[in-house]
Amino acid sequence: MSKGNALVKGNALVTGASAGIGAATVRALVADGWTVHMTARRAERLKDLAAETGAVAHVIDAADQIAMAALVSEVPFDLIVANAGAGAAMTALTDAGPSEIAQLVTLNVTSVLQLISAALPGMAARRRGHVITLGSVSGLYPTGSTLYGATKHAVRGMVRNLRIEALGQGVRFTDIQPGRVRTEFYDVAVKDAAKRDAIKETGIDELAPDDVAEAIRWAAAQPAHVNVTALEIAPTDQAYGGARFPE
């Protein structure tokens, strides 16, 4: 990946690539000169994206730790974008059943840890590599979903600690923390149709998947001696924290 401060764009892996931010990231990285591999469960969407971009498709569930570990052992990835994840229904934690809690933690936290654990030894041996995680503003601020927010707090902590754990090995870590993005997220996260429609009709000019993909591309394109540890990106009309008072 690096020679001095130069960046060599080799093999990149994008998980959860069949739609939204993942698909946009595949397009952005291919355009930027990376050899992109992508994973997702939806085979037809991957097939279409592969035909469009030339990226290499692997129909793998990101939660399938054995298959993901096999892939990273076969291909020496210089960049991994751990995008695959899910949103939790925006209900109280006590309304989430044990299976829903376990499923979300497995996909949003455990699968990311396992992927990094499988890839890091090879990156360290080559003394080059970059892992980019998809966090969320929900990992920074209380947004009203305890379960989802907890998983994104975990991802943020993961990246911060990996920066220390892998220090001196030539491996970079970045957590991208988007606000509202125009994707399928709310179709899953909000079960009540009326509430879902109300959220979508707030008038906020949401981020497009391409906006987040550009942030990912930019972080990955920095010189090898530059580590963008975290990047919060949100719509101009969305803000968290503090308080607003009448003028």
What is each of the regions a protein language model found here?
Residues 91-93, 100-103:
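Substrate-binding pocket helix/loop in short-chain dehydrogenase/reductase
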Residues 116, 151-152:
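Active-site helix of classical SDR
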Residues 116-117, 160:
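A short, exposed helix-loop element centered on a Lys and neighboring polar residues
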Residues 136:
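Residue(s) in the substrate-gating loop at a strand-loop-helix junction
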Residues 175-176, 195-242:
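C-terminal helical subdomain
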Residues 18-19:
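Conserved glycine-rich cofactor-binding loop
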